[in-house]
Amino acid sequence: MNSILPCQDQYFVGGQSYNCPYSTTTSESGVDVSKETWVSFWAAGLLDNTELQQAPQVLESPSELSFPVLDSCSWEEAQLSSQLYRNKQLQDTLLQKEEELARLHEENNHLRQYLNSTLVKRLEEKAKKLLSSDEFSKVFGKLRKEKRKPKEHRHSPAEIPQFKTAKRNLSTEFSNCEEQPGPHVDPWVLQTLGLKDLNTIDDTLPANYSATTSHPRAVPSISSLFVHDANGYANVPRDLHLDYVGQGTHGSHTTSIHQEDCHSFPRLSNPPVRVQTLPYHTADVSPNKTEMAFSTSLSPHCNVKTHSFHQGQAFVRRDEEGGWKFTWVPKQT
């Protein structure tokens, strides 16, 4: 059996260098070769016997060809492994969600127990009482009305606070308000004390120290006269000179102050003291005359004027700030 194979086949001897067909036989008994075939062989060169023996062996083993062949089993295994991995991930996610759901159920049960507790019930009862009260309804109603109104209409122009105007109106009210009437003071008392009124001192008019009788009376303890206003003064002189003035008679009398009386004047200096003592008036003497009056200089910037009446003693002195202080000490009966 003769067969003609192309010379371009790479598995034949000579490879692609043989461009002419040749005939070969597959039987072992004999080979029939034509002249054209032999001429072509001699022209191209004789083939080795080894190459002729190897050519049919190569043709007999086509399974050993190095063509790329896809393995279907390996492809299926790869697809299956990816699906298994995805299934594993879904199972893990499902377990996490189940654990979270169980935790939420537990928290929900705790909240229900707390809502059913007595504390929450008491708070609910108190809230109901507050909501049902009239005061809360009034306040809530006002708040709702304020919310319904626009911002520009919530306050009328008259209700808007104006601080400057309010201050000015307040000052006019204070200036226009009527003062409460105080106790009536006789003019002779103000003139004797050298006062224009209860709040103003008149330095231009001298005080009236005259008297109608010439019977002197003993002067009370000086410490009792200054117990309210002269605390804090020191060094009271031990000998106090008193100048008595009467109707046409003048005299001087010296008295000494006890040691315990000096303790009430710890800061009093040692200036000379001039005391004008007026006799005590009797029942037939008009009360417009003073019983006793004297003045003393406690310091260069502080003078105390003392006036004594049958009702008590009056003390007028200037303080450190330049003002005046008036003190009235009634007599003890």
Swiss-Prot record:
Start-end of Basic residues biased regions: 145-154
Task: Write out the annotated subcellular location.
Answer: Nucleus
- Annotated coiled-coil segments of the chain: 83-118
Q: Where is this region: Disordered?
A: 145-165
* GO CC entries: extracellular region; nucleus
Q: Which domain of life is it from?
A: Eukaryota
Write the record's keywords in alphabetical order, separated by commas.
Answer: Cell cycle, Coiled coil, DNA replication, Nucleus, Phosphoprotein
**GO molecular function terms attached to this record:** chromatin binding
Instruction: Reproduce the UniProt comment on modification after translation.
Output: Highly phosphorylated by CDK2; stimulates initiation of DNA replication.
The GO annotation for biological process reads:
cerebrospinal fluid circulation; cilium assembly; DNA replication; multi-ciliated epithelial cell differentiation; multicellular organism growth; seminiferous tubule development; single fertilization; spermatogenesis
Where are its TM segments located? none
Task: Give the protein's biological function.
Answer: Regulator of DNA replication. Promotes initiation of chromosomal DNA replication by mediating TOPBP1- and CDK2-dependent recruitment of CDC45L onto replication origins.
Q: Family per UniProt?
A: Belongs to the GEMC1 family.
The protein, known as: Geminin coiled-coil domain-containing protein 1
